Amino acid sequence: MNLTAKLIAATLCLGLTGQALATELKHWPAEQAKQLEAMIAANANKGNFAVFDMDNTSYRYDLEESLLPFMENKGLITRDSLDPSLKLIPFKDTADHKESLFSYYYRLCEIDDMVCYPWVAQVFSGFTLQQLKGHVDELMASGKPVPVTYFEGDVVKASEVQPPKVFTGQVELYNKLMENGIEVYVMTAAS
């Protein structure tokens, strides 16, 4: 086999390998997958990009709602270590129960989302991004529900919150976009 024939054969093999490794949108409804494929083909390798949200878009559940009790349960965030400026309302303690930061966060959300969302973002101040990433990685790797307590009226309820679970369909989409030269960015308002 001459050099030209070898190069053509190698090129065909590489092309077929690329086809075999191409991501399929298996976890998308057929009609939506078809529309996404068409959009990707129309925008492939043109220097385009796609931007997505993280919480409840790239994965199910909210990161902060599980990271707060996860870190609190480990003693990494406590009422005592909380910046005094973040003690917006009195804690709702009883003779038998000391209110958790998770419960406090929920009560702030009952006042208004514009109170609790900035509050929970600021709770993580004092941690470096590297430290937070380590705790997020640990939470995500555990995959286990995080035990919580909160007040429902004047009754203390025990429950658990789920850590984020990555949507398989979104991973497929991100991979498909990147395989076609479309940069993918994931943004979040979470800490």
Could you tell me what each predicted segment is?
Residues 1-8:
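Bacterial N-terminal signal peptides that target proteins for export
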Residues 9-15:
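Bacterial N-terminal signal peptides
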Residues 18-22:
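Sec/Tat signal peptide C-region and signal peptidase I cleavage site
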Residues 23-191:
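Alpha-helical substrate-recognition element adjacent to the catalytic core
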